[in-house]
């Protein structure tokens, strides 16, 4: 939060402590906030050997997710699909900056239909900052300096995303001659 405020962004946290909020409640907060982006930060748990940073954007309508074959439910339009290009641009900017700052194992930018990103009608991503199930990464995640570096890296990635959008909107459009 502080890293974003330093860069001039207004922030809204869906929670400040270990209070349980449903994914739907988190989505509702984002959807009623004008002109925002949504970044959900989690830590993974899998096997003790799993390590690395991965960032998820909503899979576009009609495409398979990173982990599954194409299913009939993939044809359903979701709120987050209104922002497909922005979702992947945000995921790429945040992921690249986070890898650079953290020197983590790169598990990639992936596509999924997780509840926390599928209902967001704003650009939104899910950042998995590492694996608590790994003794090496778990110890790293436990350190406040690591968590602050991750927060700063995410904020920097958001700044890079915004700069890219500003450049895109300032490029003059070619006129089409019929």
Where are the model-predicted features located?
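Active-site-proximal helix/loop segments of hydrolytic enzymes
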Residues: 1-178
């Amino acid at each position: 939060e502080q890293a974003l405020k330093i860069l001039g962004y207004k922030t809204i946290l869906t929670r400040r402590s270990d209070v349980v909020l449903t994914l739907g409640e988190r989505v509702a907060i984002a959807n009623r906030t004008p002109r925002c982006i949504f970044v959900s930060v989690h830590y993974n748990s899998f096997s003790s050997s799993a390590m690395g940073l991965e960032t998820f954007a909503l899979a576009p309508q009609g495409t398979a997710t990173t982990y599954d074959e194409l299913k009939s439910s993939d044809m359903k339009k979701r709120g987050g699909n209104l922002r497909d290009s922005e979702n992947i641009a945000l995921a790429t900017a945040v992921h690249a900056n986070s890898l650079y700052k953290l020197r983590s194992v790169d598990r990639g930018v992936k596509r999924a239909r997780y509840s926390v990103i599928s209902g967001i009608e704003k650009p939104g991503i899910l950042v998995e900052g590492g694996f608590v199930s790994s003794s090496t990464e778990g110890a790293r995640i436990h350190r406040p300096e690591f968590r602050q570096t991750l927060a700063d890296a995410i904020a920097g990635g958001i700044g890079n995303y915004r700069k890219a959008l500003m450049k895109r909107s300032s490029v003059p459009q070619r006129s089409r001659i019929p």
